[in-house]
């Protein structure tokens, strides 16, 4: 499976980013996202002919999911007239920032259906953009705001991929927020 994921990444990183980004939250719902983590860890150990880490894109492609969920919860909190729903949003937003999307998924976006699929679309586009820009992760890190350090190559110490990840995250929050207000 790991070899298949590498082949897909080499064939079309944009398609790989789109698919992983879009389906990550659906995989989370069934607990199947954990099946991709060992593949990502294995891919992180691959080196090029010069002995430099080549990085991997599975965890890169899922970066937008937490921020899309966070933005959607912000939008729902602002737009909703339902007091109970408004009370559910702040804890889900805090969890989303920290990379835990289950409260947002199960408590807010999935029951409303459309916001869930909008966040999948935003995350898929974010994954495609990150992979198109050549952003890769090189080590394990937390999720959400704690994930940015995984984009710094231990070989080159280049922080540009991390900055791209931060910008894409902010855009995900804004786009998902606006989509809920429209």
Residue ranges, per PLM feature:
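Transmembrane alpha-helical segments in integral membrane proteins
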Residues: 35-39, 68-80, 170-182
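Transmembrane helix-loop junctions in multipass membrane proteins, especially transporters and channels
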Residues: 29-36, 81, 135-139, 181
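Transmembrane alpha-helix interface/packing and boundary motifs in multi-pass membrane proteins
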Residues: 21-33, 49, 95-98, 130-131
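Transmembrane alpha-helical segments and their short flanking loops
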Residues: 4, 9, 91, 103-182
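Membrane-interfacial loop-to-helix junctions in multi-pass transporters
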Residues: 8-19, 30, 49-58, 81, ...
């Amino acid at each position: 499976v790991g070899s298949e994921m590498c082949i897909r990444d080499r064939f079309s990183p944009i398609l790989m980013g789109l698919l992983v980004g879009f389906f990550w939250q659906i995989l989370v719902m069934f607990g199947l996202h954990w099946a991709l983590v060992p593949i990502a860890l294995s891919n992180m150990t691959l080196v090029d002919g010069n002995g430099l880490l080549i990085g991997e894109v599975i965890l890169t492609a899922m970066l937008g999911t937490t921020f899309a969920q966070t933005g959607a919860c912000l939008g729902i909190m602002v737009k909703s007239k339902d007091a109970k729903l408004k009370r559910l949003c702040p804890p889900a937003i805090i969890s989303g920032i920290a990379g835990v999307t289950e409260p947002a998924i199960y408590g807010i976006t999935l029951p409303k259906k459309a916001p869930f699929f909008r966040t999948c679309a935003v995350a898929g586009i974010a994954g495609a953009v990150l992979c198109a820009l050549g952003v890769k992760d090189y080590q394990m890190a937390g999720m959400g705001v704690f994930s940015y350090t995984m984009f710094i190559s231990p070989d080159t110490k280049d922080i540009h991929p991390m900055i791209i990840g931060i910008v894409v995250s902010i855009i995900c929050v804004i786009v998902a927020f606006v989509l809920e207000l429209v």
